Swiss-Prot record:
Annotated HAMAP family: Formyl_trans (MF_00182)
Catalytic activity, reaction form: L-methionyl-tRNA(fMet) + (6R)-10-formyltetrahydrofolate = N-formyl-L-methionyl-tRNA(fMet) + (6S)-5,6,7,8-tetrahydrofolate + H(+)
Name this protein carries in UniProt: Methionyl-tRNA formyltransferase
Keywords of this entry: Protein biosynthesis, Transferase
Organism: Erwinia tasmaniensis (strain DSM 17950 / CFBP 7177 / CIP 109463 / NCPPB 4357 / Et1/99)
GO molecular function, one term: methionyl-tRNA formyltransferase activity
Similarity section: Belongs to the Fmt family.
Keyword Transferase attributed: yes
Signal peptide range in chain numbering: none
Protein encoded by which gene: fmt
Enzyme type, top EC level: transferase
């Protein structure tokens, strides 16, 4: 392979851990790992180390967990590692300009979209909700802006009709490490050719909110079906009926019908609960009432058929 690089890795969730795992098998030297402090997680709310920390510990790599990289003390920890490059994947902390410039090759980031489309916090979900035909990963040189740095490498993949944020996350977590290793090889041998992002093509992927997850029947059935897939596995799309939230895990789109208003229940049977939208009918196939597990529409109808009487309106 080309020159072995001394790498600092900064990341936190499983998505990042998959990239660290690829680096550990690559012949490069990971000299230190930065990750978020241990935090409560899971049903028991027990304090848990991040997937990246757990993997680093298995390989006896020094781990640093600062609350911020703005202090001189923490910046000195970065400098002391004397790295050639810092690889940042879903880390969760802002890197000050001083830190960005410390390694010989600076800091590079793996971003879950085809930049400059979907800069920001939720590129996977926003690409799904928007109905994009494809997405991918971009490895970029980091600067002080929000995902504004020069692009070093891109890999794309199609967005399939059944993709959810969970399945797309897995696809990009498989795609990213290959792009990262290619980029590192190009940095090492001097063949990297950074490309400036076209500002006229920029879009922003704002962080998701639970409020956005409420189904709005004034949208089209197609938009709502994409929303359901984009918000799976979090925060899960929902509607409110009888003052109770009901999460929607799966739905399909049926042709439009005349003479009905958005939110009106058209039919409710073993095929699903059919709700009129601004354009088309949303057929809800799998849903989850409060305090229950996800279930097929027919199973909920067995206990709550009165909720879904044809002609009723879901607000």
């Amino acid at each position: 392979m080309s020159e072995s690089l001394k790498i600092i890795f900064a990341g936190t969730p499983d998505f990042a851990a998959r990239h660290l795992d690829a680096l550990l098998s690559s012949g490069h030297q990971v000299v230190g790992v930065f990750t978020q402090p241990d935090r409560p997680a899971g049903r028991g709310n027990r304090v848990t180390a991040s997937p990246v920390k757990q993997l680093a510990a298995q390989h006896n790599i020094p781990v640093f967990q600062p609350e911020s990289l703005r202090s001189e003390e923490n910046q000195q920890k970065v400098a002391a590692l004397n790295a050639d490059v810092m690889v940042v994947v879903a880390y969760g902390l802002i890197l000050p300009k001083l830190v960005l410039e410390m390694p010989r090759h600076g800091c590079i980031n793996v971003h879950g979209s085809l930049l400059p489309r979907w800069r920001g916090a939720a590129p996977i979900q926003r690409s799904l909700w928007a109905g994009d035909a494809e997405t991918g990963v971009t490895i970029m040189q980091m600067d002080i802006g929000l995902d504004t740095g020069d692009m070093l490498h891109k890999l794309s993949c199609p967005i399939e009709a059944a993709d959810t944020s969970a399945t797309l996350y897995d696809k990009l977590a498989d795609l990213g490490p290959a792009g990262l290793l290619t980029t590192l090889a190009q940095l090492a041998d001097g063949s990297a050719r950074p490309q400036v992002q076209d500002e006229s093509l920029v879009s922003y992927a704002e962080k998701l909110s639970k409020e956005e997850a409420r189904l709005d029947w004034s949208l089209s059935a197609q938009q709502l079906e994409r929303c359901i897939r984009a918000f799976n596995p979090w925060p899960i799309s929902y509607f409110v009926i009888d003052e109770q939230p009901v999460k929607v895990w799966k739905a399909s789109v049926l042709p439009a019908v005349n003479g009905h208003q958005p939110g009106e229940i058209l039919q409710a049977n073993k095929q699903g609960i059919q709700v009129v939208t601004a354009d088309g009918v949303l057929n809800i196939e799998e849903l989850q009432p409060a305090g229950k597990k996800a279930m097929k529409a027919q199973d909920l109808l067995n206990s709550r058929r009165e909720w879904f009487t044809p002609g009723n309106i879901i607000a």
